[in-house]
């Protein structure tokens, strides 16, 4: 487990979270990549943050969980950058993503945030 991963997110919850990311991508707004995700967190625009567990070097995303915690934003850790990039609508992997407008996935994202909060 990477240094920046504070808790294990069960596979079924990861799958639900990635599906909600796809819905938010299609009906709302999603920020993709570490830099855009960092800006969304700092500005308080992110509803939920996704971080891949297979990022190398780890320092690229190491700041995100702590920054999100300071702002009261939940973080979902997903297994691979490819899964995250795919769900975010990219043809390549993505180390991080943030939902800034949930669209039709609003209720699902709130539920996932609550479940992730319980994991901590």
From Swiss-Prot:
Its main location: cytoplasm. InterPro entries: Ribosomal_eL30-like_sf (IPR029064), Ribosomal_eL8/eL30/eS12/Gad45 (IPR004038), Ribosomal_eL8/Nhp2 (IPR018492), Ribosomal_eL8_arc (IPR022481). It is found in: Cytoplasm. One of its GO terms (biological process) is ribosomal small subunit biogenesis. It holds the Pfam family Ribosomal_L7Ae. One of its GO terms (cellular component) is ribonucleoprotein complex. Keywords: Cytoplasm, Ribonucleoprotein, Ribosomal protein, RNA-binding, rRNA-binding, tRNA processing. GO terms for molecular function: ribonuclease P activity; rRNA binding; structural constituent of ribosome. Multifunctional RNA-binding protein that recognizes the K-turn motif in ribosomal RNA, the RNA component of RNase P, box H/ACA, box C/D and box C'/D' sRNAs. Part of the 50S ribosomal subunit. Probably part of the RNase P complex. Belongs to the eukaryotic ribosomal protein eL8 family. This is Large ribosomal subunit protein eL8. The gene is rpl7ae.
